[in-house]
Structures are given as structure tokens and as C-alpha cells.
């Protein structure tokens, strides 16, 4: 089974790190990267092509 590719976008570092830590414990999820604002999220989404983007 192919892993779900996730990008995390949040302006709070501790939230990004916490979500990433939780998601990395799941075998079927791959955290592609993190973004600290909307512009960075758009840039990374275009470059990394995630299946899911978690944003606040």
C-alpha cells in the first residue's frame, strides 16, 4: 500500500513539530515537510505534491 503524503502548515513551530511527531508514528503516513505560513505552504505544495495538507 502506498503511503499518504502529508504537508503540515502552521505558524506555531511547536504545533508543527507535535503533529509531525504523531504522524510519523503511523506506518501508512509520510510527512513530506512543514511550512510556517501560507506562502511557504503553497510553494512546498507545488514542489512536493502532497496528498493532504494540514493547515490552521
Question: Across the structure, where does each feature detected by a protein language model lie?
Answer:
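Two-component/phosphorelay signaling modules centered on CheY-like receiver
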Residues: 5, 13-33
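Active-site residues of response regulator receiver
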Residues: 10, 56
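Generic detector of well-ordered alpha-helical packing
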Residues: 11-12, 38
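Short, conserved catalytic or interaction motifs in soluble domains
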Residues: 27-28, 37, 50
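Helix N-cap/capping motif at the beta->alpha junctions
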Residues: 34-43
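Active-site beta3 strand of CheY-like receiver
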Residues: 48-54
Amino acid at each position: 500500500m502506498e503511503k499518504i503524503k502529508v504537508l503540515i502548515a502552521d505558524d506555531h513551530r511547536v504545533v508543527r513539530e507535535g503533529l509531525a511527531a504523531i504522524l510519523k508514528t503511523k506506518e501508512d503516513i509520510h510527512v513530506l515537510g512543514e511550512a510556517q505560513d501560507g506562502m511557504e505552504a503553497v510553494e512546498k505544495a507545488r514542489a512536493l505534491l502532497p496528498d493532504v495538507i494540514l493547515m490552521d
